[in-house]
Amino acid sequence: MCGLCGFTGEIVDRDAVLENMTEVITHRGPDSKGFYTDDKISMGFRRLSIIDLDNGSQPIYNEDKTLVLMFNGEIYNYKQLRKELHEKGHVFATDTDSEVLVHGFEEWREDLLNRLRGMFGFAIWNRTDESLFIARDFF
């Protein structure tokens, strides 16, 4: 499965530290890597491609790029959730289960967790209010 890492706050050589953290977890995802950094947070990701092999690079954003997602796992009911979110007006750029999480969080906030079926761990950074939501499956 994929791997994610990150830290908050300012540190010396932030980009180098994040790159090193991401390299340490290369065995979790050899197919690609992704990064997100701003003044408050740094997140890294290693991807093992399973679904939507060409379009699943992370981070994943919502439509206006106010929410940033790093995700590890598999959401079994993502097609059902995607359909429901699409009917509510959400616009999807990929066919990934990852993108369902960011739009689901945008729509339902923490209640998203009660709708998910699968195995997962993820972090969502809200750039607007500078809050971090981290969750994992119940098992």
Language-model-detected regions and their locations in the chain:
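N-terminus-centric sequence/structural signature that marks the extreme N-terminus
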Residues: M1-F139
